[in-house]
Regions:
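N-terminal membrane-anchoring/stem segments of glycan-assembly enzymes
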Residues: 1-42
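Cell-envelope/extracellular polymer assembly enzymes that use nucleotide-activated donors
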Residues: 44-47, 76
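Short aromatic/hydrophobic "clamp" motif used to bind/position activated sugar donors
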Residues: 122, 134
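Acidic donor-binding segment of Leloir-type glycosyltransferases
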Residues: 63-113
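Acidic donor-binding/catalytic loop of UDP-sugar-dependent glycosyltransferases
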Residues: 87, 132, 138-153
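Active-site acidic short loop of glycosyltransferases
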Residues: 43, 72, 101, 127-132
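Donor nucleotide-sugar binding loop of glycosyltransferases
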Residues: 55-58, 84, 144
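A short, glycine-/small-residue-rich helix N-cap motif at loop->alpha-helix starts
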Residues: 57, 111-120, 142
Length: 153
């Protein structure tokens, strides 16, 4: 009979521990929920630096995704190439024509700052960046419309 009493109290204790764990988990679960983005009016000015090289498949669509950002703060997109014959130049010019309200700059500078071409390209386009908040991105990715807001948060 004593064994049944001990088993009963053991299972009650385990049930209480499980209940306490569930209550604590419910209490602190809010810490892991995505926080809302700040109001658009308080967004920081951003310079987005995009070093380009060549005309990879889908480049126009990838670059266009950066032009379609849902971000109310000032945005400057600075594209950079090191070769005047780079096939990405006409794509950038088409974006400038398609999105005239955006501040889009194209920097052509073949100056080398070391053995890494991408780093040299970034160093060349840094001078054209007007804002303190800099976001760097490769040319071969597409992003969702809230990408810039999440990055600038």
């Amino acid at each position: 009979m004593l064994i049944f009493l001990l088993l009963g109290w053991t299972f009650c204790g385990l049930a209480l521990c499980g209940t306490a764990y569930a209550l604590l988990a419910a209490r602190f679960a809010g810490r892991f929920v995505k926080k809302p983005l700040p109001d658009n009016a308080s967004r920081a000015a951003v310079s987005l630096l995009k070093p380009l090289h060549g005309g990879a498949p889908g480049l126009a669509e990838d670059l266009e995704s950066f032009c379609r950002q849902d971000y109310a703060g000032p945005v400057q997109i600075v594209f950079g190439v090191q070769d005047a014959a780079d096939p990405s130049i006409p794509i950038v010019e088409a974006l400038k024509a398609r999105f005239p309200a955006l501040e889009i700059a194209l920097v052509l500078d073949d100056k080398s700052h070391g053995p890494n071409a991408k780093v040299s390209n970034l160093a060349n386009i840094m001078a054209a960046a007007r804002h303190d908040l800099l976001i760097l991105s490769d040319d071969d990715i597409a992003v969702p419309p809230d990408w810039l807001a999440v990055c600038a948060e």
